[in-house]
C-alpha cells in the first residue's frame, strides 16, 4: 500500500481529447509535499508516513511543533497529515513526492472539506419535498412537518433529519481518473469534481476499490532531500525481481 499526497485545489477546467471531446477536470497542486516522519510498528503500533505541504511562518508556531520540523530538517509546513502504508512503501524523511507519483489513467480517492453553506432548511439540506402549496397550508410551505410520534415514543430520535448547519464536512470522492500530469509545475488533473473550495487542502490516495496500475512507481516517485531524484521501479518490475 503506497502513500498518498497532500495537494491544494486550484479550481476546475476542461481538457480536450484527440477526438475533440472535452473532459471536466479539477486541478490539484502539490506544494512541496515532503515526508516529515515515519510511524513504525515497534514505536507506534502501526506503519505510516507523516507528510507536510505548503509554507508556514514560525512566528506563532509552538516550540514543540518547530522542533518536529527541525528534526526532519524541512521547512515548516502549513498542512500535516498521515498516510497508512505498508512496510515496503516507506519513503525517506525529507524526500519530496512528485506529481508523477501517480500515472495517467489510474483511479484515485480524494478527501476534502466540503464548502460551508451555513444554516439550511430541510428542503435544501435533506431534499425534503415540503408541504402542499394550498389546501390549508399557510406560511409553512417549506417546513419539515412532524419530527416524531405522539405520547409514544414522546421524543424526537437522534439523527433525525432537521434544519441545521450544512457543509464543512469531511467528504471522500471515490474513483476519480487521473487525466493529465504536469510534473514541472506539480499539477494533477483528475476527472470530475473534488470536494472543497479553491485553495482547500485535499488528500489524494490510490483508489481502494480499483487495482493499482502495473506501471505505478513503488514505493513512489520522489526527489531526495539532497537534490537527487529517486526513480522508483514500477510495481510489476519489483515483483519480478
From Swiss-Prot:
GO cellular component entries: cytosolic large ribosomal subunit
Post-translational modification: Methylated by PrmB.
Top-level lineage group: Bacteria
Keyword Transport listed: no
Self-association state and partner proteins as the record states: Part of the 50S ribosomal subunit. Forms a cluster with proteins L14 and L19.
Annotated Low complexity bias: 225-241
NCBIfam families: L3_bact (TIGR03625)
Residues carrying N5-methylglutamine: 151
Protein's recorded name: Large ribosomal subunit protein uL3
Keyword annotations: Methylation, Ribonucleoprotein, Ribosomal protein, RNA-binding, rRNA-binding
Stretches of the chain forming a coiled coil according to its record: none
Keyword Transferase in annotation: no
Amino acid at each position: 500500500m503506497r502513500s498518498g499526497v497532500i495537494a491544494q485545489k486550484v479550481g476546475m477546467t476542461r481538457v480536450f481529447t484527440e477526438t475533440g471531446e472535452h473532459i471536466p477536470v479539477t486541478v490539484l497542486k502539490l506544494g512541496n509535499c515532503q515526508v516529515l516522519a515515519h510511524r513504525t510498528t515497534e514505536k507506534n503500533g502501526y506503519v505510516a508516513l507523516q507528510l507536510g505541504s505548503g509554507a508556514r511562518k514560525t512566528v506563532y508556531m509552538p516550540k514543540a511543533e518547530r522542533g518536529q520540523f527541525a528534526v526532519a530538517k524541512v521547512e515548516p509546513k502549513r498542512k500535516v497529515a498521515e498516510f497508512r502504508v505498508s512496510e515496503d512503501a516507506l519513503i525517506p524523511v525529507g524526500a519530496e513526492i512528485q506529481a508523477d507519483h501517480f500515472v495517467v489513467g489510474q483511479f484515485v480517492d480524494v478527501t476534502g472539506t466540503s464548502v460551508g453553506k451555513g444554516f439550511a432548511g430541510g428542503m435544501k439540506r435533506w431534499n425534503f419535498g415540503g408541504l402542499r402549496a394550498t389546501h390549508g397550508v399557510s406560511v409553512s410551505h417549506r417546513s419539515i412537518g412532524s419530527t416524531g410520534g405522539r405520547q409514544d415514543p414522546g421524543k424526537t430520535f437522534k439523527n433525525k433529519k432537521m434544519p441545521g448547519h450544512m457543509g464543512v464536512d469531511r467528504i471522500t470522492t471515490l474513483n476519480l481518473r487521473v487525466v493529465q500530469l504536469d510534473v514541472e509545475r506539480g499539477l494533477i488533473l483528475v476527472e470530475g469534481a473534488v470536494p472543497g473550495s479553491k485553495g482547500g487542502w485535499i488528500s489524494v490516495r490510490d483508489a481502494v476499490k480499483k487495482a493499482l496500475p502495473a506501471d505505478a512507481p513503488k514505493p513512489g516517485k520522489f526527489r531526495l532531500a539532497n537534490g537527487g531524484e529517486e526513480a522508483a521501479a514500477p510495481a510489476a518490475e519489483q515483483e519480478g525481481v
